[in-house]
Amino acid sequence: MQLKDFDFDLPASLIAQHPIKNRTDSRLLIKRSSIIDIQFNQIGDFFQSGDLLIMNNTKVIPARLFGTKETGGKVEIMIERILDENQVLAMIKASRAPKIGSCIFLENDVNIIVYQKDNGFYTLIFETDSLFDLLNNIGHTPLPPYIKRTNNVQDLSRYQTVYAQKDGAVAAPTAGLHFDDSLLAQLKIQGIDHLFVTLHIGSGTFTPIRTDNIKNHVMHSEIFEISQVTVDRINLTKANGGRIIAVGTTTVRVLESSLKNGKLIAQNGETDIFIYPSYQFRIVDSLITNFHLPKSSLLMLVSAFIGRDKMLELYKHAIEQKYKFLSYGDAMFLEKNNDL
């Protein structure tokens, strides 16, 4: 398939720039025999007792830092991945690239050594005993490039799921932003439980596809984890006829990456899985996801799940009804198309 097959006109006015007041007040598009437009807090009406929600519990770190080179030039650092207790993989924006072996000075007198560069990413060594304390003190929330404003205090909590546990992401698993503790408790009373996987989302999630033939696209790699507890519960749910409902595309990528010889395996690893039309889903039955950019890998995953024509139909409806798109936008709840 060609990249142009996944294009559509997205009015800039529909790209949400701020979160709404209450998480669960966002809008939700549901496709059954017809298109249903409701609020997210009504989603429980479309679940069945015995369904299982799988959520990504990664936690967004304050990954943007500002510093000064030895020459006095200003730099912006965007952390991509934590490597160990004081080393990170990062991108650096500067008028001139920093030299390998040079220092970058942060505002709290912490030095960073520019250790090496590979494939556009720098390995940086922080001269600190507590990297996470440092980031929490002077780091900034790494808002996506399509949010055209500076971050604020509200983003610290709202660009984070209420169930975020494991530090490591530089972008939020945005489908999960619509849940609050009250909704999760209500669903549990209905017999709909939730468990977690982890995928630390990197900045590669925002990288545009540049190949005309989408099959030639090389997907970015991200660290993930799925526990034996989650694997066992998924297997039990399926055996009992319940649905596996993935909250977000990152959860889908973990689940579909964790199969070996047709069996779901607990593991820690990395995945560069690229899901596009013709992919056969083996674990996920239903998907909750936000609205995505034209020609993005996330849009292709949705197209693989429900069919490209159906995706374009739903997106046309969403644009006509002025749904909000992307991270702080609205959501859709989809059933897998088993006829693809």
From Swiss-Prot:
It catalyses: 7-aminomethyl-7-carbaguanosine(34) in tRNA + S-adenosyl-L-methionine = epoxyqueuosine(34) in tRNA + adenine + L-methionine + 2 H(+). Its EC number is 2.4.99.17. It holds the Pfam family Queuosine_synth. One of its GO terms (biological process) is tRNA wobble guanine modification. Keywords: Cytoplasm, Queuosine biosynthesis, S-adenosyl-L-methionine, Transferase. One of its GO terms (cellular component) is cytoplasm. Gene3D superfamilies: QueA-like (3.40.1780.10). InterPro entries: QueA, QueA_dom1, QueA_dom2, QueA_sf. It comes from the Bacteria. It is found in: Cytoplasm. Coiled coil: none annotated. Pathway: tRNA modification; tRNA-queuosine biosynthesis. GO terms for molecular function: S-adenosylmethionine:tRNA ribosyltransferase-isomerase activity. Its main location: cytoplasm. Belongs to the QueA family. Monomer. Transfers and isomerizes the ribose moiety from AdoMet to the 7-aminomethyl group of 7-deazaguanine (preQ1-tRNA) to give epoxyqueuosine (oQ-tRNA). This is S-adenosylmethionine:tRNA ribosyltransferase-isomerase. The lineage of its organism: Bacteria, Pseudomonadati, Pseudomonadota, Gammaproteobacteria, Candidatus Pseudothioglobaceae.
